[in-house]
Amino acid sequence: MSTASAFSSIQGCWFKGERKIRVADKRAKRLTLGSHVASPSSMSFRVSASSSVKPEKDIRIGLLGASGYTGAEIVRLLANHPHFQVTLMTADRKAGQSMESVFPHLRAQKLPTLVSVKDADFSTVDAVFCCLPHGTTQEIIKELPTALKIVDLSADFRLRNIAEYEEWYGQPHKAVELQKEVVYGLTEILREDIKKARLVANPGCYPTTIQLPLVPLLKANLIKHENIIIDAKSGVSGAGRGAKEANLYSEIAEGISSYGVTRHRHVPEIEQGLSDVAQSKVTVSFTPHLMPMIRGMQSTIYVEMAPGVRTEDLHQQLKTSYEDEEFVKVLDEGVVPRTHNVRGSNYCHMSVFPDRIPGRAIIISVIDNLVKGASGQALQNLNIMLGYPETTGLLHQPLFP
C-alpha cells in the first residue's frame, strides 16, 4: 500500500470512535513493560570471521553507518532488547576498528568489529538499520537481499515524489524502483502498514514532532489547512557527528541560530504527511533553530482553529487519539512540555494552549531528536515489522536531570 493510501486508511482504523481496536497490540504493550560509501558495483558483501559475533538472540541485526550518532544510539537501545543482537556493523572510515574505540561508552557490549560496506556479508543478518547520510543509501539498499527487513533512517525514501526529492536534495534518485514499496514509518499513525513492510523510511526528527500533534487535528477537521506556522528548535546532535566549524563549542555556546530558513529539507516531508491526512494541499511556514544543547527538540506550532472550535476541543482530540499509545503523552491543560523530560527516551510530550489572538491555538511538542526523532522510532518500527511488541527495548525512562 502506498503512503498516500495508507494515510487515507487512517479514517477507518486509527481514531477512537472510528478505529478498529487492536486488542492484541494493546495487550502486548502492557505485557512488555519490562559519508563516503563504496559503490555497490564494487561490493562483494563479505565479512571475515573475526568481524562477526556469534548470535545469542533470535534476530541478527546489521547496522550500516555505525559510527554516527544515530548508529550509536541504536546500539545503546539494543543492549536491553531480548531478541535483537547486532552481528554486523559498517563504517567505511572506521573499518577495522572496534566500536568501543569509536564510542567508549559502549565498551560493555559484545560487538563485532567495524567493516566497510563493500566487505559486508548481508547473508549473516535478518534485518538492517541504515544510518548512512542521504544520497549514499539508495544504491546500497537496492543491492541488499530482498528477504531482509530494512529501516532506513536517511531521507532517501521519505518523499514519494521523486522530482521533489531531487529538487530539495539536489541529486538524482538512484533507486526509483524501490519507492513504490516503501512505507513511511510514523509509527503511531501507520502501524498497520508498517507490519507488512519490507522497507520502511524512518521519519525525520522535525516531521515527527510536527505530524504527531497535527495529524489527529487535521483528520478531525478541527484546524484549518492554511496559516500553519512552526517554530522549531533542535540540539546540536541533530546536525550529525561530522566536524563542522559552525558546530564548534565556541560557535554554538551561549547563542541560538536559525538555519535552513525558507528551504529546510524537512518541509516537503511535513507537507506530504499533512496533505495526505487532510486530503488536500497543506503548506506550512517552518523555521528551525539550533540550540546550545546536545539532545532535544521542540516544535511550537501556531494553528487557526475551525469555526466554533475551542482549544479544549483540540486537547481532548489529542487525548482521545493517543490514550492507548505508550510513547505519546498528552499533558494536562496548562502544563508546558520540556525537552528535559523526554531526554534519552522514546517519548513525545505535547500540549495545547490558547493564543491571545482569537481563533488561534498554540501546540507544543517535544522529543529527543536521537530517540523518538531517529533511532528509537526506527527500533519501534522494526519491532512491528518482525512481529514483536513495539515497546520492546524502548521502555527506558527519560534521563533527568
UniProtKB/Swiss-Prot annotation:
It is an enzyme of class 1 (oxidoreductase). It is found in: Plastid, Chloroplast. The active site is at C205. CDD domains: AGPR_1_C (cd23934), AGPR_1_N (cd17895). Keywords: Amino-acid biosynthesis, Arginine biosynthesis, Chloroplast, NADP, Oxidoreductase, Plastid, Transit peptide. Residues 1-48 form a transit peptide. SMART domains: Semialdhyde_dh (SM00859). Its EC number is 1.2.1.38. Pathway: Amino-acid biosynthesis; L-arginine biosynthesis; N(2)-acetyl-L-ornithine from L-glutamate: step 3/4. GO terms for molecular function: copper ion binding; N-acetyl-gamma-glutamyl-phosphate reductase activity; NAD binding; NADP+ binding. Its main location: plastid. Belongs to the NAGSA dehydrogenase family. Type 1 subfamily. This is Probable N-acetyl-gamma-glutamyl-phosphate reductase, chloroplastic. It comes from Arabidopsis thaliana.
